[in-house]
């Protein structure tokens, strides 16, 4: 028994992954990142009994929960996983249950420990847990904190999706934040742009700063900030990624000059826009050699509205993302774009070259110049109105000659 115990410790285990795809091992990139973590590392699971997800992380579930870290523990034997149990009010927790209306957190703890047949003294009180760490900014929901011996720490969260637990991508991204300065994505604001601080259907909080969204930039190794370059803010020299998302009023002269200087020094800029914004967006886009065509694209279909364009990834796009390189051409996958316009390119002062990412079919797609309501009205390509069914580009990437 003693031999079995000691040989089952992470530092004593040697693993040979015989799967063809190395399914049971960390990717080479994750191994490279993990190797840069020096000294012991601790992952502490903070489990709030009054959180609506607490049942997943109670003591009886320890072994199941630790499986996601097994590859990391095998690669780094001095990585230790710990648990801290506490109880405190959670905005999305059991306090929302009508049976707990008017109950104190102590009364809720007593009821929940009775239901789960647990010792109430296992759980630290709100005052006790706050002496260790204040998790109210995390909504007092379940969270893991990875910490190094020299005090560097990062959050590893669960997510509000079907899988819930973080994958290797999110765990490694969190580790990378501890060993290097994460790149900051700066969203331009002040001109009616879509905002990261709002959760409306036209805003960007879900994929930028929402803590419990798997796809959020902050959970994929980035930091996020907002910057108002039109009204006083200066672009910091450390910023190399900016987003200009569908401004509704033109940039001021100061803002435009800043953005041009930023591009001239080699900064990356994502420009996102929608149909109907040509008047505001085209003056700035023209300086980059890009123009949004005036009318929307239409696609003939027996099943869908004419404004639904089913775009395909170009061969060139495969150089930018492995998804477009492998899956899209292999399975003839499409990107659905309900309501879009074609983009045309011309010479520019920055030396940009253009890489088309998405394009339409060569047949059955045209710029509809006669009708504006493309959701319901049947439309046809009318050559006499100057409409032509050819392949159109509606998403492009820019590269300078130095980037190639």
Model-derived features: positions:
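Residue-level marker of positions within ordered structural domains that often coincide
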Residues: 48, 151, 180, 290, ...
